Swiss-Prot record:
The PX domain binds phosphatidylinositol 3-phosphate which is necessary for peripheral membrane localization. PANTHER family: SORTING NEXIN MVP1. This is Sorting nexin MVP1. InterPro entries: PX_dom, PX_dom_sf, SNX8/Mvp1, SNX8/Mvp1_PX, Snx8_BAR_dom. Its main location: cytoplasm. It comes from Yarrowia lipolytica (strain CLIB 122 / E 150).
Length: 605
């Protein structure tokens, strides 16, 4: 058995694959790979002897694609599988076990979590940017606000205004700088600036590239497509006394089978959090509130509220499934089909979720045709119009709901009118007109009875119209309201998480270049100059990764704006539903009152 196969088997036996994957993702792999130098630098931070470190580097070079088997690790790159194998070798070496014998390595089933040295711990840093509210700066402005670096060990914070506590960003030694460059965190661990700087499109486009960019092929987005999933409230509640919760049965069709699963509100909330973590820059639908509160006091969850929340959850899950990207996610499909308990599954899926841009590179055609001025104007205008339109549609939903409630109240009054009209001259009260018994009493009594029946029919029509409005026109208005809201929140997330640390990295490159010049002038040791050169190289690679991510965000939002354009079809459907309902019930009312007219026109007057 080869060393790679033995190490892979040991990874499966120990169950440390997810730990090693987490470290792999921290280096922001490009096309599913990270430079092999990351492993060599990682070896310098673990507690093993120098001889073992050299041996580990040699073994890693032998299992890498492109490695020459004799320490050729600097010219190679790691895939996720080879990274797991190499990191397991280091883990085994740290435990003092034989790490170069496949026959012994394959039997390893228990390991101590990797222990990093103080230098390695010091290199664990977080990038953060202070952002509050909606920025008033352009979407692609030249400046970044309040860049800061926070050390997880010393709690030192260095701001870009030059004031610092603890270490200075310019006083760190090259080893700490290189470790900092290698500690790129995933998007879920970063709070980036709200205003990414403008990037030069030609910097990423080869001269030979040509053509017109088109969005990646996706399933067709049809905002008015019929719901593929239905929700119903389960009558029996679960949980302990005073902490009982409502369950929902989700019914969907998979092939020829109809699948029904049970979920609670917190499960839907988890699904939204998962989508926001993985698809931060896409239109993630909005959830209805879990409970209603007035002045900080929660209202009781009566049947009326539970029904409204059920409709809101139905809109949420169906809008997720309609989205050409979100709806194809494996976790979303599993959410609506997995019958088993999903507690463990949710934890596993959420912990392993990574931003959708991991391992992707921007299409050069998109960069080439990008018009920054046009995009800035378009996006800024969209933000303003989204706010205005959203507020108007919110008011529309309130008014439609109010009309439906008035119809229900009017139906109750119509029922009372029908009752009292029928009781005005009952058969037992004919004694009122017994003196002049000319036959008119009987005709009028029959007329009252028929009028009462017609008014009862009118009452039923009003109730049907109110219910139809709530599940028809009002639901369509709410779907459009939530489409506007999800797009508006997308731009909010862009401002909060769409920035980068390019200015900070460029400043650090300039500082290190100056140090290299000074070191050459004073004829410093070549090892010091090489460390500075490696730091500059790693910073340059990080800038390229940040630029690539910024372009991917722009491409993603451009695609989402294209999808959003189709939501105008929801307005058409809303108007059609409104018109059809009005014509339908106008004809029914006309037929009902026309029949009453025929019944009463021949009464004696």
């Amino acid at each position: 058995m080869s060393l790679f196969s033995a190490a892979t088997t040991a990874v499966e036996r120990t169950g440390y694959g997810s730990r090693y994957d987490h470290i792999f993702d921290m280096f922001h792999p490009i096309d599913g790979r990270i430079p092999a130098v990351c492993y060599k630098r990682l070896l310098e931070t673990i507690n093993v002897s120098g001889e073992d470190k050299d041996r580990l580097a040699t073994l890693a070079g032998s299992i890498l694609e492109g490695g020459d088997g004799s320490g050729g690790i600097l010219t190679s790159s790691f895939t996720r599988e080879s990274w797991r194998a190499a990191l397991l070798l280091a883990n085994v070496a740290q435990d003092g076990l034989p790490f170069d014998d496949p026959s012994q390595l394959v039997n390893v089933d228990t390991l101590t979590p990797m222990d990093f040295s103080e230098e390695g711990e010091r290199s664990s840093i977080n990038f953060s940017a202070s952002t509050t509210g909606r920025s008033q700066t352009p979407l692609f402005g030249d400046d970044l606000d309040d860049h800061s670096i926070q050390s997880s060990r010393s709690e030192s914070i260095i701001h870009n205004n030059g004031h610092s506590r603890g270490h200075s960003a310019l006083d760190w030694n090259p080893e700490e700088q290189e470790a900092l460059q290698q500690s790129q965190l995933s998007q879920s661990q970063l709070s980036r600036s709200t205003t990414p700087p403008p990037l030069n499109p030609q910097a990423l486009v080869p001269e030979s590239e040509s053509g017109v960019w088109t969005a990646p092929p996706r399933p067709d987005f049809a905002p008015n497509k019929a719901d593929s999933v239905t929700l119903a409230i389960v009558p029996e509640r679960e949980g302990m006394f005073l902490f009982r919760h409502v369950n929902y049965s989700i019914s969907s069709v998979s092939g020829t089978d109809r699948i029904t699963v049970i979920r609670r509100y917190s499960d839907f909330s988890w699904l939204q959090d998962y989508l926001l973590k993985k698809y931060c820059f896409r239109q993630v639908p909005l959830l209805p509130p879990k409970r209603l509160a007035v002045n900080g006091h929660y209202l009781s969850s009566d049947n009326y509220f539970l029904e409204r929340r059920r409709r809101g959850l139905t809109r949420f899950i169906n809008q997720v499934l309609r989205h050409p990207v979100l709806g194809q996610d494996e976790a979303v499909r599993t959410f609506v089909t997995l019958r088993n308990d999903i507690s463990g599954w949710k934890k596993s899926v959420f912990n392993t979720a990574r931003e959708e841009f991991n391992g992707r590179t921007i299409d050069p055609k998109f960069v080439q045709q990008w018009d920054e001025q046009q995009a800035t104007a378009l996006w800024a205008g969209l933000i303003v119009e989204l706010d205005r339109s959203h507020d108007s549609v919110v008011q529309l939903c309130v008014l439609l709901d109010r009309v439906a409630k008035r119809q229900e109240a009017q139906a109750v009054d119509s029922a009372k009118i029908a009752y009292n009209l029928g009781a005005a001259l009952p058969p037992s009260a004919r004694v009122l007109y017994s003196v002049a018994d000319d036959g008119c009493v009987q005709q009028i009594t029959r007329g009252l009875s028929r009028a009462s029946a017609r008014i009862e029919t009118d009452c039923q029509l009003q109730q049907d119209e109110a219910r139809g409005s709530q599940v028809g026109v009002l639901e369509e208005a709410k779907k459009y309201r939530e489409a506007l809201g999800s797009m508006r929140e997308l731009f909010d997330r862009l401002e909060k998480y769409g920035g980068n640390n390019i200015p900070l990295l460029e400043k650090r490159i300039q500082q290190n270049q100056g140090r290299v010049t000074l070191a050459r002038q004073r004829k410093a040791l070549m090892s010091e100059i090489e460390k500075l050169d490696r730091a500059i190289k790693m910073d340059t690679e990080m800038i390229a990764a940040h630029k690539n991510r910024t372009w991917l965000i722009r491409e993603c939002i451009t695609e989402e704006i294209g999808l959003f354009q189709k939501t105008q079809l929801q307005i058409s459907k809303l108007l059609q539903e409104f018109c059809v309902d009005k014509i339908k019930y106008a004809e029914l009312y006309s037929d009902n009152w026309g029949g009453l007219d025929n019944d009463v026109m021949d009464l004696p007057v």
